[in-house]
Amino acid sequence: MNTCSLSRLAAGVIALAIVFSASAAPGQGPVLPLPADDQQLIGAHLGTGVVGAARPCEPIVDASRYFPLQERDFTFQVTSGSHTGNSQTVSLKKARRPGGAVAWRFGFAPTLAGFITTTSGGDLLMTAVSDVHEGVIVFTTPANPFVLASIKPGESRSFKQKVSVNYLDDPTRRDWGGRLNATYTYVGSYEITVPAGTFDTILIRFAYRGKVGPADVVYTAWYFFAKDIGLVAMVNLEDVSAFWIYHVDTTIGKVLAVR
């Protein structure tokens, strides 16, 4: 092998070493491109220019960093759905329970709220969702995952749920129940630009399908969480084949308008 060939070989080895050391640098997790199907649906409901480049991502160690349980208001701009163009201000509130326990309620919309609890392992779970406009509360067993601690980038967790729909005017009355097949996925980390600013976020996709009474239910949600901020963008797509059971207008996109 001549001197020129040795030089080229040495240069190639050095280049590979640089690339490898960069990808293995401390604190640098995998970079997971946004899947094409997700990109298309998210873009259609959040608008162009909101989702930027994929970023290095890491396992979720402390779920509360991505959704801090502190009382505050969030102002979102609605980007798709029947209220497109409107602003909505919702709240994260806590309530005391016997024995000193704390319960949390987060408003996804002015009339739609999720009830959040923390497990001993640090997971944030949503135990129920209420819609005061329709006068119903929906329970799922096990509870819906919101932010899970220790889940890894690209990991999916699938599980089965029981669901019941109860009426606020008569909580003991349960006309409809059913079963769902759900999948919770840590899709990756992406730069997000919204009116409130530009953030590095993690993207969680939560999807389920099944039957509630005679209705076929298909639901997918995408949640973008920024550390120490919480939700900065979300898309909810719901398809219920029998709206006369109950109807929640959750086919919407929203972006954080005020930090």
Predicted regions and their residues:
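Short hydrophobic/aromatic-rich motifs at helix boundaries and adjacent loops
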Residues: I18, H45-T48, K160-K162
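Extracellular-facing segments of soluble proteins and assemblies that are Gly/Ser/Thr-biased and enriched
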Residues: L112-D175
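Bacterial N-terminal signal peptides
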Residues: A11-S21
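Acidic, serine/threonine-rich low-complexity disordered tracts
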Residues: Q28-G121, S130, N166-R259
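Bacterial N-terminal signal peptides that target proteins for export
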Residues: N2-V13
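Signal peptide processing junction and immediate N-terminal pro/mature segment
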Residues: A22-Q28
